[in-house]
UniProtKB/Swiss-Prot annotation:
Topology of the protein relative to the lipid bilayer: Peripheral membrane protein
Species of provenance: Chlamydia pneumoniae
Keywords: Cell outer membrane, Cell wall, Membrane, Secreted, Signal, Transmembrane, Transmembrane beta strand
Residues making up the signal peptide according to the UniProt record: 1-25
Claim: Secreted is one of the keywords in the record: yes
Gene: pmp10
Domain Autotransporter: residue ranges: 635-928
Family that this chain belongs to: Belongs to the PMP outer membrane protein family.
SMART domains per the UniProt record, alphabetical: Autotransporter
Protein name: Probable outer membrane protein pmp10
NCBIfam families: POMP_repeat (TIGR01376)
Subcellular location: Secreted, Cell wall; Cell outer membrane
Keyword Repressor assigned: no
Length: 928
C-alpha cells in the first residue's frame, strides 16, 4: 500500500512537471523574406508579431521592415512579448528596421517583463529611425526595450542610427546589456534620449553593461541625452574590454546638471584590454565631458592606447572634469599596459563670465586616485592638469608605478605632466599648468616627468631608490601638507635658460625638503647641446629648495652627472654651486650651474657633406659632356654638320665609414656643330644644359642647373718614329698608319640650390655656384687585323685628362644657417684602353666597344670649412671621395638614314672602388 502511494505521488509529480514544461516552453518559429514589409509600397496593413508565450525565431532569409506607421503609428513593437522571453537566431541573414513610427516601448523589439531578449548569428542588424529622432509625434520610446537581459552575440555589423526615446535609452533600454563577439562594425549614431531628466542617448541599463570581444571598430557618435550619459548610462557596472577600436565622438548631455558627455556610470566603469580607445569632442554641462563615474578603471590594451582629446564641460558656471569627473567618495585607476594614455585639449568652459581652463580629471569630495602607472616603454600624458575638490582629502598614499599585490608586471614607464601642448595665451593661466593630488604621493618606480612650466601639488612626496624625478627648469614639485624627499633628480639640458629653475617646495609649517644623490643632466632628444646659448661660457639658474622647515642636500656632487658625456653640439664642462638663505621665509637653498664652452662637434645633419660632394657631381657631368662631344665628332658621312643629343648622367657613391651615401643625377641636352679646316683638321663646338639633383640620404637635397660649352679639335698624322715602333709591339701592322691626335676644352657653370630639412629645427636654404674646367689631350691609331671577326678595327689609345672645379663660398639664411668656405677639386687622370669598331658593308651603320683603365695620377680631394652663422662654431666638412682607379666600358653606335642625317648614341659605365657612374646620350646629326 505504501509502495502504491509512493508511485502515485511520483506519477503525479512527473505529470505536473511535464505539464509545466509544455506551458512554459518557448515556441519555435521560422521567419524569412515573406515577413518583410515596406509600408511605402505595400497597400496592405502591417501586423506586428505580439506574443505572450515566448518565441524562438529562426531566420530563413533576410528580413526588412520599413516605412511602418505612416498612416497610423504602431502601438506595439514589430516583435514583442509581454510575458516571456524572445530569441532570434540569424543563421547568417540580416534583420533591418527602417523608418518606423511607433509609440511602443521598443518600436522594433520589446520584452516588457523581466524576461530576456537575444539576437545571435546575424550578418547585420540595422535599427534606423526606429523610431526617428527627428519626428516628435508620436513621441518615440526607443528601438529595443528589454526588462531582463539583452544579448547581442556572434553577429556581423550592428547599426543603431537616429533612434529616439522620450524615456531612458535613445536606442536601447534594458536591465542588463551584453554586446559581444561581433565580427563587423558596431555603430550608435545620432540617437537621442532628450526628454527632461532622461539618460543614455544610445544605451541605458538599470543593471550592467558588457561590451566585450568585438573584433571590428565600435563607434558611438553624436548621441544625445538630457541628464546623463550622452552615449551610455549604466546604473550597475559597465565593462568595456577585449575590443579592437572604440571611438566615442561628439556625444553630449544637455541639462544644466548634465553629467558624462559620453558615458555615465553609477557603479564601476572598467575600460581595459582594448586595442585602442578614443574619447573626442564629447560635451557635458556639469561634470565629466567624456566620463562621469563612481569608480573608474582605465587600462590600455593595445598599441593605439587610450586618448581623451577636446572633450569639454561647458555651462554658465564652471563645471568639473573636462574629460573625466569622479563622483564623491569615488576612485580612479589609470594603467598604461600596452599603449599610452593621453589627455590633451580637454577643458572646462564657463560662459558667465567667459573663461576656459584646461582640465583632464576632477577628483570629487573624499575621492582618490588609486593607480597611476605605466609599463616600461609607455606613458600617461597629462597635457591638461588634474584638479581636486577642496574636500578631496585622502590619507591613502598614491604609489606611482606600483603593481598590485601578487602582480609581477614591471611598471617602470613615465607619468608625464606637461604644458607643451598649451598655446601661448593658455600658458599664461596658472590653472592650466597646475595639477593637484590631495593625497600623499610616492614614486615607486619608473619616471615622474614635469615639463614646460607645470606645477604638481601633492600632500607630500617621497621617492623610492631606482626611480627618477625628471623636471624641466621652470617646473615645480610641491607638498602642501607634508615633506618632500627626493633621491634621484634629473633635469633636461634643453630646458635651461631664461632664468628658469627647478623648484622643490614644502609649504606647510616646519616641513622639510631633502635632496640626495647626484643630479643627472639629460639630453633626451639628442640635440640639447645644439642650444646656441651653450656657444659661450655662462651661468644658468638651476635648482631651488624651499621649505618652512629645513632645505638640505646630502651626497650631491659639485659636478652634475651627464647622462650623455659623448654628444654632438657644443662641447664643455659643467659645475654647480649652492647658496643657503636661512634668514628668509621660507628658507631656500639655491644652486647655480656653470657652463664652460670648449668647442663644437657637428651632428650628422649639420655636417653638410653635400656641398663638397657637389664637386663630384660637377665632375661626372663634365666628363659626360666630354663624351658627347667626342661621339658627335665621329661620323659615317660628312664631317660637317649640326647635331643635337639628349644626355643623362648618374653617379652613385656608397657609404664609406662615417661618410654617408651620395647620389647625383642629371639630364638635359647638348647642341653643336662640326667642320673641317683648310688643313683638314676636324673641329667641333657644343653648348649643353643639364638639370640635376643631389641627395645625401639624410636631410639635405640639392638642385643643380648646369650650363656648359666645349671645343674639340682632331688632327690626323702618320704613325711613325717612336710611336710607330711602340705600336709595332702590339698585334697588327702600325707603320705609316694614321695617328689621330685630339684635344678638348670644356667649361661649365653650375648653379646649386640646397635645402636642408632638419629633424628638430627649421628648414634652411643656401645657393652657390660651381665653376668647372676640363682639358683633354689624346692619341690613338687604328689597325685592321684579319683575325677579329666581330670587329673590323681596333685602336689602342691614351689620354691625359685634367679637371679643375671650384665651389664658391656662401651662407645659408636663418638662425640655423651655416656658412661654407670655398673648396676645389683637382684631378689629373691618364685613361688608357682600346677601342673596337665594326662597320656595315654599306658603311651606313657602325658599332663600337671601348675598354679603359683610368688611374688618377694627381688628386686634390674637396673639403671646406663650415661654420654656424649665429655662433661662429666651425668644423671641416669632407666629401665622400671617389676611388683613384676606375674601369670604364663604353658602347656606341651610328646609323645613317641618309647622307644628310645620322643617328648616334652611346652608353658608358664606369666603376670605382665604391662608386658607379652611368651616362647615356642619344642624338642626331644633320650633315652638309
Amino acid at each position: 500500500m505504501k509502495s502504491q502511494f509512493s508511485w502515485l505521488v511520483l506519477s503525479s509529480t512527473l505529470a505536473c512537471f511535464t505539464s509545466c514544461s509544455t506551458v512554459f516552453a518557448a515556441t519555435a518559429e521560422n521567419i524569412g523574406p515573406s515577413d518583410s514589409f515596406d509600408g511605402s509600397t505595400n497597400t496592405g496593413t502591417y501586423t506586428p508579431k505580439n506574443t505572450t508565450t515566448g518565441i524562438d525565431y529562426t531566420l530563413t532569409g533576410d528580413i526588412t521592415l520599413q516605412n511602418l506607421g505612416d498612416s497610423a503609428a504602431l502601438t506595439k513593437g514589430c516583435f514583442s512579448d509581454t510575458t516571456e522571453s524572445l530569441s532570434f537566431a540569424g543563421k547568417g541573414y540580416s534583420l533591418s528596421f527602417l523608418n518606423i513610427k511607433s509609440s511602443a516601448e521598443g518600436a522594433a523589439l520589446s520584452v516588457t517583463t523581466d524576461k530576456n531578449l537575444s539576437l545571435t548569428g546575424f550578418s547585420s542588424l540595422t535599427f534606423l529611425a526606429a523610431p526617428s529622432s527627428v519626428i516628435t509625434t508620436p513621441s518615440g520610446k526607443g528601438a529595443v526595450k528589454c526588462g531582463g537581459d539583452l544579448t547581442f552575440d556572434n553577429n556581423g555589423t550592428i547599426l543603431f542610427k537616429q533612434d529616439y526615446c522620450e524615456e531612458n535609452g535613445g536606442a536601447i533600454s534594458t536591465k542588463n546589456l551584453s554586446l559581444k563577439n561581433s565580427t563587423g562594425s558596431i555603430s550608435f549614431e545620432g540617437n537621442k534620449s532628450s526628454a527632461t531628466g532622461k539618460k543614455g542617448g544610445a544605451i541605458c541599463a538599470t543593471g550592467t553593461v558588457d561590451i566585450t570581444n568585438n573584433t571590428a571598430p565600435t563607434l558611438f557618435s553624436n548621441n544625445i541625452a538630457e541628464a546623463a550619459g550622452g552615449a551610455i548610462n549604466s546604473t550597475g557596472n559597465c565593462t568595456i574590454t577585449g575590443n579592437t577600436s572604440l571611438v566615442f565622438s561628439e556625444n553630449s548631455v544637455t541639462a544644466t546638471a548634465g553629467n558624462g558627455g559620453a558615458l555615465s556610470g553609477d557603479a564601476d566603469v572598467t575600460i581595459s584590454g582594448n586595442q585602442s580607445v578614443t574619447f573626442s569632442g564629447n560635451q557635458a554641462v556639469a561634470n565629466g565631458g567624456a566620463i562621469y563615474a563612481k569608480k573608474l578603471t582605465l587600462a590600455s590594451g593595445g598599441g593605439g592606447g587610450i586618448s581623451f582629446s577636446n572633450n569639454i564641460v561647458q555651462g554658465t558656471t564652471a563645471g568639473n572634469g573636462g574629460a573625466i569627473s569622479i563622483l564623491a567618495a569615488g576612485e580612479c585607476s589609470l594603467s598604461a599596459e600596452a599603449g599610452d594614455i593621453t589627455f590633451n585639449g580637454n577643458a572646462i568652459v564657463a560662459t558667465t563670465p567667459q573663461t576656459t581652463k584646461r582640465n583632464s580629471i576632477d577628483i570629487g569630495s573624499t575621492a582618490k586616485i588609486t593607480n597611476l602607472r605605466a609599463i616600461s616603454g609607455h606613458s600617461i600624458f597629462f597635457y591638461d592638469p588634474i584638479t581636486a575638490n577642496t574636500a578631496a582629502d585622502s590619507t591613502d598614499t598614491l604609489n606611482l608605478n606600483k603593481a598590485d599585490a601578487g602582480n609581477s608586471t614591471d611598471y617602470s614607464g613615465s607619468i608625464v605632466f606637461s604644458g607643451e601642448k598649451l598655446s601661448e595665451d593658455e600658458a599664461k593661466v596658472a590653472d592650466n599648468l597646475t595639477s593637484t593630488l590631495k593625497q600623499p604621493v610616492t614614486l615607486t618606480a619608473g619616471n615622474l616627468v614635469l615639463k614646460r612650466g607645470v606645477t604638481l601639488d601633492t600632500k607630500g612626496f617621497t621617492q623610492t631608490a631606482g626611480s627618477s624625478v625628471i623636471m624641466d627648469a621652470g617646473t615645480t614639485l610641491k607638498a602642501s601638507t607634508e615633506e618632500v624627499t627626493l633621491t634621484g633628480l634629473s633635469i633636461p639640458v634643453d630646458s635651461l635658460g631664461e632664468g628658469k629653475k627647478v623648484v622643490i617646495a614644502a609649504s606647510a609649517a616646519s616641513k622639510n625638503v631633502a635632496l640626495s644623490g647626484p643630479i643627472l643632466l639629460l639630453d633626451n632628444q639628442g640635440n640639447a647641446y645644439e642650444n646656441h646659448d651653450l656657444g659661450k661660457t655662462q651661468d644658468f639658474s638651476f635648482v631651488q629648495l624651499s621649505a618652512l622647515g629645513t632645505a638640505t642636500t646630502t651626497d650631491v656632487p659639485a659636478v652634475p652627472t651627464v647622462a650623455t658625456p659623448t654628444h654632438y653640439g657644443y662641447q664643455g664642462t659643467w659645475g654647480m654651486t649652492w647658496v643657503d638663505d636661512t634668514a628668509s621665509t621660507p628658507k631656500t637653498k639655491t644652486a647655480t650651474l656653470a657652463w664652460t664652452n670648449t668647442g663644437y662637434l657637428p651632428n650628422p645633419e649639420r655636417q653638410g657633406p653635400l656641398v663638397p660632394n657637389s664637386l663630384w657631381g660637377s665632375f661626372s657631368d663634365i666628363q659626360a659632356i666630354q663624351g658627347v662631344i667626342e661621339r658627335s665628332a665621329l661620323t659615317l658621312c660628312s664631317d660637317r654638320g649640326f647635331w643635337a643629343a639628349g644626355v643623362a648622367n648618374f653617379l652613385d657613391k656608397d657609404k664609406k665609414g662615417e661618410k654617408r651615401k651620395y647620389r647625383h643625377k642629371s639630364g638635359g641636352y647638348a647642341i653643336g656643330g662640326a667642320a673641317q679646316t683648310c688643313s683638314e683638321n676636324l673641329i667641333s663646338f657644343a653648348f649643353c644644359q643639364l638639370f640635376g639633383s643631389d641627395k645625401d640620404f639624410l636631410v639635405a637635397k640639392n638642385h643643380t642647373d648646369t650650363y656648359a660649352g666645349a671645343f674639340y679639335i682632331q688632327h690626323i698624322t702618320e704613325c711613325s718614329g717612336f710611336i710607330g715602333c711602340l705600336l709595332d709591339k702590339l698585334p697588327g701592322s702600325w707603320s705609316h698608319k694614321p695617328l689621330v691626335l685630339e684635344g678638348q676644352l670644356a667649361y661649365s657653370h653650375v648653379s646649386n640650390d640646397l635645402k636642408t630639412k632638419y629633424t628638430a629645427y627649421p628648414e634652411v636654404k643656401g645657393s652657390w655656384g660651381n665653376n668647372a674646367f676640363n682639358m683633354m689631350l689624346g692619341a690613338s691609331s687604328h689597325s685592321y687585323p684579319e683575325y677579329l671577326h666581330c670587329f673590323d678595327t681596333y685602336a689602342p689609345y691614351i689620354k691625359l685628362n685634367l679637371t679643375y672645379i671650384r665651389q664658391d663660398s656662401f651662407s645659408e639664411k636663418g638662425t640655423e644657417g651655416r656658412s661654407f668656405d670655398d673648396s676645389n677639386l683637382f684631378n689629373l687622370s691618364l685613361p688608357i684602353g682600346v677601342k673596337f669598331e665594326k662597320f656595315s658593308d654599306c658603311n651606313d651603320f657602325s658599332y663600337d666597344l671601348t675598354l679603359s683603365y683610368v688611374p688618377d695620377l694627381i688628386r686634390n680631394d674637396p673639403k671646406c670649412t663650415t661654420a654656424l652663422v649665429i655662433s661662429g662654431a666651425s668644423w671641416e666638412t669632407y666629401a665622400n671621395n671617389l676611388a683613384r682607379q676606375a674601369l670604364q666600358v663604353r658602347a656606341g653606335s651610328h646609323y645613317a638614314f641618309s647622307p644628310m642625317f645620322e643617328v648616334l648614341g652611346q652608353f658608358v659605365f664606369e666603376v670605382r672602388g665604391s662608386s658607379r657612374i652611368y651616362n647615356v646620350d642619344l642624338g642626331g646629326k644633320f650633315q652638309f
